[in-house]
Amino acid sequence: MYEKLLQELKDYTYFCGWKYETRNGSRTKVPKSVKDHNADNSNLDDFCGFSEIIGHIGKYDGIGIAITGDMAAIDIDHCIEDGKLSDMAEEIVSKVNTYTEISPSGTGIRLIGKTHGFNYDKEKYYINNRKYGLEVYAARDKGQFVTITGNAIGDKHVRDITDVLPEILEKYMCRPVLVKLFCNTLFDKYLTVTGLHR
């Protein structure tokens, strides 16, 4: 499977393995370093090049990369049914127009792109919006582990998504806005995105 992985991803230097483990009663993917311990997302020394991780592939359930620096990733969970993408997933794939692959579960997708000079406002936008099953990782000083399968949809390369990412964030990742206005000592007025309430 991984021999079909894009060369530009193979040239990336921050790979790790991952294994399924049960934590708090839930099955989760745990990143693993070739140094025989769990990979720490904040320590890029725990990651390695593609050829090295492939040399250890027998230890793991799969491989992944650290999203750090100018790398970006969009995860959409549970968006494939009967081999078709959901409307939201189709929209995002079309707009972002970058490398896209099917996740290990076979029911989700991941898009990999790059951003330059992008500021991810975590106070304004979710990183993980469970309402849509959507996660966005970009402009991170510390790594965020994501799985890589090589099971690509189409033949797109990893492209710069700096200009299109804000549109995705505005539509799907905005946190609720609630501004409290202090009008006097007796009454507080609340202004929300839907109107003014007393």
Regions found by a protein language model. Give the residues of each.
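DNA replication initiation modules
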Residues: Q7-L9, W18-T22, K32-D46, I65-D82, ...
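ATP-grasp fold ATP-binding core
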Residues: C16-K19, T100-I102
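Short linear proline/tyrosine/threonine-rich motifs used for host-factor recruitment
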Residues: R27-K29
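Active-site-adjacent substructure of cysteine-protease-like catalytic cores
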Residues: H78-I109
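A short, charged, amphipathic alpha-helix used as a generic interaction element across diverse proteins
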Residues: E52-G55
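Short Gly/Ser/Thr- and Asp/Glu-enriched loop/turn motifs at secondary-structure junctions
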Residues: Y12, I67-G69, I102-G108
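Short, conserved interaction/coordination micro-motifs, predominantly
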Residues: M1-D11
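Residue-level detector of short, conserved catalytic/binding motifs and their immediate flanks
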Residues: T13-F15, A72, T98, I109, ...
